[in-house]
């Protein structure tokens, strides 16, 4: 293909009358006429802010606007059916679709757990500034609105390497979770802050083999369900090089 042209088909403050998926389906022919050969879509799954979420506060990767969760069925961009229709319309006009995906973290846990942690220096994440202690944190994800459809995997504190909120203490800090996979962080591409594994929310621990398997299963399901042509992986400098 000569001169392939990819358009970022979203922005942070999108608020037009048509939701984004409907707009994309309507504009597919026009985009092709302008020479666009690919579109980059925002995260299509449910974030912790439900229908208001931009998509980078990942809650449920399997909820593409299908289930009543986080106070909404659809996402900010529309329903699962509208998403699939937009992809189909773009494909009819020979336009590829890239899905934005956040594997780095999850947000909006459903249940509290008691978690062993150590505080770290926010400017140097390799420096512990406390001994081990226990907090209560929103680290259990059961996705009650989905009720096990597509995946019965339950995320708990063993799936995460760090968090930033202690519910019982009502305290915000960076807490390194102490689990069977290590007391600190994973090796990641970025050495900012000493080690930039932790970015925000519940930081996913790729040292856990069950986590790796679940994300691979999700990728297979997503390709089969949506027909997208590829992924743009968000926040890669914060993700384990071994997983990448």
Q: Which stretches of residues belong to each language-model region?
A:
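Short catalytic-loop micro-motif centered on adjacent basic/acidic residues
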Residues: 98, 230-236
């Amino acid at each position: 293909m000569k001169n392939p042209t990819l358009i970022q088909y979203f922005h942070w403050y999108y608020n037009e009358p048509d939701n984004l998926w409907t707009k994309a389906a309507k504009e597919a022919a026009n985009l092709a006429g302008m020479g666009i050969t690919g579109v980059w879509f925002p995260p299509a799954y449910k974030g912790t802010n439900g229908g208001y979420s931009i998509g980078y506060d990942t809650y449920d990767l399997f909820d593409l606007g299908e289930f009543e969760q986080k106070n909404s069925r659809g996402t900010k961009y529309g329903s699962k059916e509208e998403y699939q229709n937009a992809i189909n319309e773009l494909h009819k006009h020979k336009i590829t679709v890239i899905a934005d995906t956040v594997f780095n973290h999850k947000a909006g846990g459903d249940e509290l757990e008691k978690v062993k942690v150590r505080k770290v220096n926010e400017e140097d994440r390799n420096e512990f500034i406390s001994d081990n202690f226990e907090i209560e944190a929103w680290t259990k994800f059961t996705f009650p609105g989905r009720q096990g459809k597509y995946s019965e995997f339950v995320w708990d504190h063993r799936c995460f390497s760090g968090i930033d909120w202690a519910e019982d203490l009502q305290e915000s800090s960076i807490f390194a979770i102490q689990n069977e996979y290590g007391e600190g962080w994973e090796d990641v591409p970025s050495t900012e802050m000493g080690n930039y594994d932790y970015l925000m929310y519940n930081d996913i621990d790729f040292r856990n083999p069950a986590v790796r398997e679940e994300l691979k299963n999700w990728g297979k399901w997503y390709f089969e369900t949506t027909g997208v042509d590829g992924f743009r992986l968000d926040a890669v400098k914060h993700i384990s090089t071994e997983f990448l």
